[in-house]
Amino acid sequence: MRETPSPQTLRAFLNGHGIAVSPQQAEMLFEHVRLMLEWNLRSNLTRITEFDRILTAHLLDSLLPARWLPLTGKTLDVGTGAGFPGVPLKILHPETQMYLLESNRKKVSFLKVLLAGLSLPGIHVLHGRWEEPEGWFTEEDERFTAVIMRAVRVEPGHLTRLAPRVLRPGGVFASWAGSGTETALENRRTHAYPAPAETRSYELPGMSAPRRLYLWRMEG
């Protein structure tokens, strides 16, 4: 695909991969990409700067696993970076309450500018570290239906210590991963590193190995 970047080409690309996108949603997704590339000239938001590659490596990779996620409640996107997957998921699933957690101040500033321009209700930026929930989550806060991680490596403590503090009973902890992660999980699996309840695979165009989504469910 070597077409002029536009909301129309973005929409055609996603529609061609089975993701229904309205013209208004395509405009918002395109603005996300456009502003990210503009800010990337002075801030390190992404190493991927070609429009075609962004469509695959950021947008499509964010949206294809949506079919396996509970996106009707309150969702936390950990280490969201430039807003992937949280912002695209929120645009296509407006019913979810999306919270974007990011520790980098420049990326937090970018996200605030992006969300102000999109005027998208029900999406919030949290400045903090996943490992320090006391800085962004209190016992009075409503727990999350889903915690999602696309660019953060899952550690045992994420599942045994942190997830129970912020996930509601029956909630889902989801991690995006490349094909090599399955072996790593098998090698490190202990009682403190439980097996995923589900493993889902999907393919991205131009990539030889499948991507995977690992899902853990919080005990009720």
Curated annotation (Swiss-Prot):
CDD domains linked to this entry: AdoMet_MTases (cd02440)
Top-level enzyme category: transferase
Annotated coiled-coil segments of the chain: none
Binding site for S-adenosyl-L-methionine: 79, 84, 150
Location in the cell: Cytoplasm
A GO CC term assigned to this protein in UniProt: cytosol
Keyword Transcription assigned: no
GO molecular function: rRNA (guanine-N7-)-methyltransferase activity
Record keywords, A-Z: Cytoplasm, Methyltransferase, rRNA processing, S-adenosyl-L-methionine, Transferase
Database matches in Pfam families: GidB
EC number per UniProt: 2.1.1.170
Top-rank lineage group of the source organism: Bacteria
Catalysed reactions, semicolon-separated: guanosine(527) in 16S rRNA + S-adenosyl-L-methionine = N(7)-methylguanosine(527) in 16S rRNA + S-adenosyl-L-homocysteine
Purpose: Specifically methylates the N7 position of guanine in position 527 of 16S rRNA.
Family membership noted in the UniProt record: Belongs to the methyltransferase superfamily. RNA methyltransferase RsmG family.
Name of this chain's protein: Ribosomal RNA small subunit methyltransferase G 1
Lineage: Bacteria, Pseudomonadati, Thermodesulfobacteriota, Syntrophobacteria, Syntrophobacterales
Name of the encoding gene: rsmG1
